[in-house]
Amino acid sequence: MTPDQVGELLNVSRETIEKFQAYLTLLEKWQRRINLVSNSTLAEAWQRHILDSGQLAAHYPPQTKHILDVGSGAGFPGLVLAIMGGVTVDLVESDQRKAVFLSTVIRELGLPAKIHNQRIETMPNLRPDVITARALATVPKLLNLIETQLHPDCACLFLKGASVEDELTNLQSYSTMVATTYPSLSGSTGVVLELKNPR
């Protein structure tokens, strides 16, 4: 998938596409030193990483301004959402080397984002509008990890794979949140999982 095709699917400007490219250039440079993503995904980075992450923006609740991205790793989805604009993003990454990479991208691209080099469980409540995560943990474990960040108006947007239905089997036994899944734009087996408190 080409940069222009991804840009069209995400409905972003030429300037945003150029920032995505600058981000991927930094990713490839750092990937030689530290393992940020699977090497096999680099050739398809526009689809596997940029589109996969950026599709979450279409699922923001109204008036979303503040994102908390947990287990940010190489910055997917958090940095992609910061590049797309309209929100500020707090990224949580406990691995120091990955946190340095994230800080470098934020600084060089001038992004509205902040990196927290610590574990999510040790953080004060930041009152985010949306909490995001990709490839971090199962749904029960994720909700346990972010428990101190949740509040009644907070929504969760998680990028999940084919096993998501199994993960949601006993949702009602440990959470009052309501789950909705949407097909992923980036792959046939992936889904966007939305968790919200009932109104």
Question: What kind of feature is each model-predicted range?
Answer:
Residues 1-64, 68, 97-112:
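Class I SAM-dependent transferase core
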Residues 54-128, 132-133:
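Conserved SAM/SAH cofactor-binding pocket of Class I
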Residues 98-100, 139, 164:
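Short alpha-helix immediately C-terminal to the canonical SAM-binding loop
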Residues 143-155:
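A short glycine-rich, Lys/Arg-flanked "PGG" loop and its adjoining helix->strand segment in the class I
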